[in-house]
Amino acid sequence: MPIHRTAYLFRCAEEADCSAVSELVNAAYRPADAAAGWTSETALVAGPRTNPAQLLALLQRPRSCLLLACCEAGHIRGCVHIEADRDDAYIGMLAVWPQQQGSGLGKQLLQQAEQWAIREFGARQLLLSVIQQRSEL
C-alpha cells in the first residue's frame, strides 16, 4: 500500500469528538481483523480499548489534552493523550488510523505532543508507558 503524505491540523479534542476518537483507538488497538498490524492488542487484551465515556472523562481532567491529527477534510486520523503532573507530562493512547500507519503520522503526533506539553504545561520531562506484554516495545 502506498504511503500518502498529508498535512494535518493538530488540535485538542472536544466532547463532540469522543465517538470518533473511540472508533479510531479501537480500530488501531483492537481490530476485528486477526491479520491486523503490529499495534493490535487483540491477542493480549479482550474487549474494547476505550469508549466515548472514558474519553470524555480524560477531556475533563485538569491539565489534560487529547491531541488530534485531522486531515484537511476534518476527519480524525490520529490521536495522543497528554496529561501533566507537576514538571512531567505523561503521553499515552497514541493511535493512528490503520490505513495511515507507517506514514509518519505517529512520529508527527509525538512531536506535536512534546511541543504541546512544553508550551502549555511547562513540562520538563515526557514519560511514555507501553503495555507490559509487548516486550518488543
Language-model features, listed with the residues they occupy:
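Conserved GNAT-fold acetyl-CoA-binding loop/helix
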Residues: 26-55
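Conserved N-terminal entry element of GNAT/NAT acetyltransferase domains
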Residues: 1-19, 23
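Conserved beta-strand-loop-alpha-helix junction that forms the acyl-donor binding cleft
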Residues: 101, 127-137
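Conserved beta-strand in the GNAT
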Residues: 68, 75-83, 90-95
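Conserved acetyl-CoA-binding loop-helix of GNAT-fold acetyltransferases
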Residues: 96, 102-115
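Conserved GNAT acetyl-CoA-binding A-motif
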Residues: 110, 117-130
